[in-house]
C-alpha cells in the first residue's frame, strides 16, 4: 500500500500532511472538472427531466448506481409547495429511495439479491424495508407499474 500511496502522491492525486494523514489532491478535482466539461449528461437529460416534471408535477432526479448507493447527478424541482429535493452529488442508500428501488427492480435479480443481502440494511424510519424477503413484493410491484415511490422511508 505504501508504494501505491507514494505513486498517487507523486501524481498529485493525494496530499500528505506532516502527521502522515492523506487527503484528496487537486489533480482529482482537475480530472473531475475535465470529465464534467467533456460529458455533461445533466445538460443532455435536463430537457427530458423538465418535461417529465411538468407532466407529473413532481421533482425528477438523474441518478447513477454506485455499489449499494445512488448518487444524484441532476435534479429538476417540482413547482409544488411541498416537494422532494436532493443535493447534487448526494450519496443515498439504495434500499430506501425511489431511485435505488428502480435500480433494484430493473437490474438483474442476482444483483438485487447481492446488494440487499450483502450487509445490514439500516432502518432510517419505521417504514424502511430492511430485508431481501421484504423487498421481493415491492420490486415485483415496481416492475409491474413501471415506477417506484418512496413513502417516508
Q: Residue ranges of each PLM-predicted region?
A:
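Cytosolic regulatory regions built on CNB/CRP/Popeye-like sensor folds
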Residues: 10, 110-113, 130
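Amphipathic alpha-helical effector-binding/dimerization core
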Residues: 23-119
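Short beta-strand
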Residues: 16, 63-64, 152
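Short, basic/aromatic recognition patches
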Residues: 44-52, 116-153
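Basic amphipathic alpha-helical segments that dock to polyanions
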Residues: 5-9, 142
Amino acid at each position: 500500500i505504501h508504494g501505491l500511496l507514494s505513486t498517487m502522491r507523486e501524481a498529485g492525486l493525494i496530499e500528505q500532511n506532516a502527521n502522515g494523514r492523506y487527503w484528496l489532491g487537486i489533480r482529482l478535482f482537475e480530472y473531475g472538472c475535465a470529465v464534467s466539461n467533456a460529458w455533461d449528461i445533466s445538460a443532455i437529460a435536463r430537457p427530458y427531466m423538465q418535461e417529465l416534471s411538468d407532466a407529473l408535477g413532481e421533482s425528477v432526479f438523474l441518478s447513477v448506481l454506485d455499489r449499494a448507493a445512488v448518487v444524484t447527478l441532476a435534479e429538476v424541482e417540482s413547482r409544488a409547495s411541498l416537494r422532494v429535493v436532493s443535493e447534487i452529488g448526494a450519496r443515498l442508500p439504495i434500499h430506501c429511495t425511489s431511485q435505488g428501488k428502480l435500480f433494484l427492480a430493473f437490474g438483474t435479480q442476482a444483483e438485487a439479491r447481492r446488494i440487499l443481502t450483502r450487509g445490514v440494511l439500516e432502518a432510517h424510519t419505521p417504514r424502511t424495508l430492511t430485508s431481501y424477503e421484504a423487498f421481493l413484493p415491492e420490486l415485483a410491484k415496481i416492475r409491474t407499474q413501471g415506477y417506484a415511490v418512496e413513502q417516508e422511508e
